[in-house]
Amino acid sequence: MFSITTLRDWTPDPGSIICWHASPTAKAKARQAPISEVPPSYQQAQHLRRYRDHVARGLDMSRLMIFTWDLPGRCNIRAMNYAINAHLRRHDTYHSWFEFDNAEHIVRHTIADPADIEVVQAEHQNMTSAELRHHIATPQPLQWDCFLFGIIQSDDHFTFYASIAHLCVDPMIVGVLFIEIHMMYSALVGGDPPIELPPAGRYDDHCVRQYADTAALTLDSARVRRWVEFAANNDGTLPHFPLPLGDLSVPHTGKLLTETLMDEQQGERFEAACVAAGARFSGGVFACAALAERELTNCETFDVVTTTDTRRTPTELRTTGWFTGLVPITVPVASGLFDSAARVAQISFDSGKDLATVPFDRVLELARPETGLRPPRPGNFVMSFLDASIAPLSTVANSDLNFRIYDEGRVSHQVSMWVNRYQHQTTVTVLFPDNPIASESVANYIAAMKSIYIRTADGTLATLKPGT
């Protein structure tokens, strides 16, 4: 199983540290890279603008995807050097950097020849755990080399780490790193030739297609109308976490909390209940949140947005980049019945997947003032389901690598929730503003949700009454 935690909680085993940095020659080539006509994706543009705005206000925004895993023995530096450089040269998401040429316009620069990209190893002497954590958290999205790779060599094993700007990747990078760095490295040190990989897709091509698709949208487009209707039912924007979160005008660092919802047997019984209701496990996840919110707030309709991967074609599935989109979900829960909630939640999720290709930012651009639409406010709620019991994530989750994912614990304005299904248990991880009011609210939400999972799995969930 892999774990999700904050970077400040990571205390690696003592050892010598070797980090791969962009070479001076590669940095010079990047600075000279010509302007590209390829636009940033909507995800990238939103991220860059948020980062710039946070910096202007003196705030430190989360911006990285950080991973570690352990391997036995001593690291073969030559083999690891090959694996890392091959990965960076293979994927065009690493070949660009961005700058603002005026208040809003973002310009992309692209290195023409992937062979010009090179990272070289450097040993860091006498670095403490705190210094290492700071070092790993340094990449920022307005630099080309917004990625770091390295190892910590202990007596009988080494820990590999990767710190990559979210600008370049999304959660699917987990499987990519496992194959292209871990498995490639293992093949090389085992005396085998480099793993043969199919041609990678181009994220640039996705950005061009996305720009053309979103440029063709109007307020009359069906996908836009559905977003407008969803936002109108949530005070003109995306849904807010239903319980108090404290004063969010004051910046708070993010706090991460993980709780077990069900063991393996309970998870199997819960899935059977979902299927009996005409849903899948994912529908049951949103149903439990909806019923928990009904218990806590007496609401009769549950609204939330969830993340999903928008890769669809075989080429896109081989493309590294930021493809994550949002799906709006609405679940009526007046009946208080799990079966009906799960069934409707599944329908809402499945029928809303095509909306993930329409960024909410684009809807805001198209919206007329009379629609009353506005950007998400602090405290918005994003809920995701991650199934690590099936491929490709099961390969990582079931390995003996001690695979870990880290959040930086920087300023957090929203509540992000991940329900994670593993082979032997189901957990929930929540990232939220670190203050006493938000902590109490999140704890109450998790407790209510866990109770519904357990009662559903045990077949003891009767019709729920508000406030019970």
Curated annotation (Swiss-Prot):
SUPFAM superfamilies: CoA-dependent acyltransferases. Its EC number is 2.3.1.288. GO terms for biological process: cell wall organization; sulfolipid biosynthetic process. It comes from the Bacteria. Belongs to the PapA acyltransferase family. Required for the biosynthesis of sulfolipid-1 (SL-1), a major mycobacterial cell wall lipid. Catalyzes the acylation of trehalose-2-sulfate by adding the palmitoyl group at the 2'-position to yield the intermediate trehalose-2-sulfate-2'-palmitate (SL659). Changing D170A: Loss of sulfolipid-1 (SL-1) production. GO terms for molecular function: acyltransferase activity, transferring groups other than amino-acyl groups. Pfam families: Condensation. This is Trehalose-2-sulfate acyltransferase PapA2. Keywords: Acyltransferase, Cell wall biogenesis/degradation, Lipid biosynthesis, Lipid metabolism, Transferase. It comes from Mycobacterium tuberculosis (strain ATCC 25618 / H37Rv). Changing H166A: Loss of sulfolipid-1 (SL-1) production. The gene is papA2. It catalyses: 2-O-sulfo-alpha,alpha-trehalose + hexadecanoyl-CoA = 2-O-sulfo-2'-O-hexadecanoyl-alpha,alpha-trehalose + CoA. Disruption phenotype: Null mutant does not produce SL-1. Disruption of the gene does not alter the virulence of M.tuberculosis in mice.
